[in-house]
């Protein structure tokens, strides 16, 4: 039976820090916490013998709990100065060991652990010093709680849990809701301690039941409960681990490989961990054949190159690994020698200037060369930005191969990859060569070579060109918007101060706002924390109808976010010379194959509201003789659903250009097409799109504001009307359960381990993924093929217009007026014919001087 160990990194390193005596290296680096953690780690390995291990860490950024409750963890003492630098040090050691390290902004280590534990069906062991994790105990999950130091550990299983606690695991949340938790500053019900809380839970089981029967409870306790009802429910939310926080749950990425690479032993020597350094059984002392997971220093030679003549004996046509860093360029020809071109940082250092170093390897970046790199787009960016050089070699991209083989998504650096596969970080070119050899074989086995060679690899070049092209921003419009929003904010602040009867009120101060709302205006009771009353969005939205000041505060925050995130947020990203924004496209992040972007994230701009429209008006064509052309797929996922399910009524409706939503409404509501109301059509549209995502009756009811029963009837009638769709969705789930993954029209795979979970909600989530992945992933495949085709047509027809942006199902071209008609024709032809289906793909074209006008 396979075993998975999940470790709360922050919790255990904290325990180790206080359990171990002070340890410093000769350079004064504190290491006691890392040393203690490593001892616990190796003890765990010998006792549990896990197949998979992951260590989760908190990030410094506020979590969703801080946003929910300002006082969350507010009473925590600052981290000791000697502990703070040991956390990144521990992460470095773990990554060298090839141990999976997880962290996620907005979530805590508990949430990461809970998500992985609940989305896998492997016997799981959680190591933590935080009792919150006890709520995760079930038939497949055991919690090892570190009570004191690093050796006093208590085991909690589903069999001994009630005996140890008098509760069932889920009641840990209920307990904290009632009695609070001083360590996390969870308030609970004031005046209710552990004994009283346990008594209540023995009788009523849950907080909800306590309040349902609060009339039975007598005296002061009843008063305390009634007075603190909102606080109890808030505390329950704060204490509940988020088991769906969005981290990668593919355990293949957590496989533990022992013994560990010699790089770990070298790190232990550097940290002066003599006992661990001398434990020879921990390390791989043998040389492994090429393609293995490690290679001893004795086997691979590193040779410093003094001139390009030394490399001239190697044919550039032979597949070669090449890596660029700030300190060196390394190249590996498959001969057991990694050639190194050192780059000096100052004139006094040994080595070459960057341009001199590049001249030595330049031959391997030009046409005719066959190379392997990690992230081709980044290599091209480095050469262009730092050396004004073009990268024209025929390049294989290890980052893309890894992405397609694992298809888990999530950004990965070369260092992460080397750690994952147990390679020396000091031999990057050799590691790239060897890992590529392993993964390309897997790529072929999985039938993904066409997707890699015909889509992802050429798309990398298209994205590079789009990043270079950039998007023109009307700086005048941006400044006008900035002034406009500043005026709106100023006006809102005046209104708020007038209603508060306080001309000096700082509207941006939660403390001052809280005092005005809850003490002066007496709007509700408010929850006072150490730093003042909570004025979070949840709190204010609950008070919106209570006083005219509340919606003004919410509006102020909305405009302020718009101002800071987009208007002011764009300004530092605009190239001062050209006035262009150059977003960066992420090709290997999402599990579905969709692209994302950053700096700025142009895919997150609101689409339908007025604010989003205002932002789009700021993006303009590059000159008076240019326009923006937007080409947007119409209902692409619904069209794919129709084709894949072979649903003739839907296929006929789409191919005839009829209103699919109106026809669906007519059938679901059993009325003639002529009698379909706008409300019926909206509801049918929600059903059509909801089906794609495996929507529940509850989700549909919430969307269209109806009862669960009515929503259930709509879904039932829909599937009776379109039985082919129901059969297709069921087949998607069956296929995924049988094979462990779903796949797209181009055979892109997404592995869905949630389908094997013993937890019903987790399995349901897996089923929804299985239903949706073939549609959402195929949509990504289609637009990627279209992007390549459009780019190739623009080049082959010698046009000057440029493809500049992809957002969801939309492509944007900055086109010359003289090329407007031909670009429109190219977009329509290439996008609508990207794949051959029974259903016509339709593209809606818009033209304008701004993105808003074109959209």
Where are these regions (language model features)?
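Extended two-metal-dependent nuclease catalytic cores across DNA- and RNA-processing enzymes
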Residues: 23-24, 74-247
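C-terminal polymerase-core module
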Residues: 487-494, 498, 502-551, 720-768, ...
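Conserved beta-strand -> loop -> alpha-helix junction used to position metal-binding or nucleic-acid-contacting
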Residues: 6-11, 128-129, 134-159, 389-407, ...
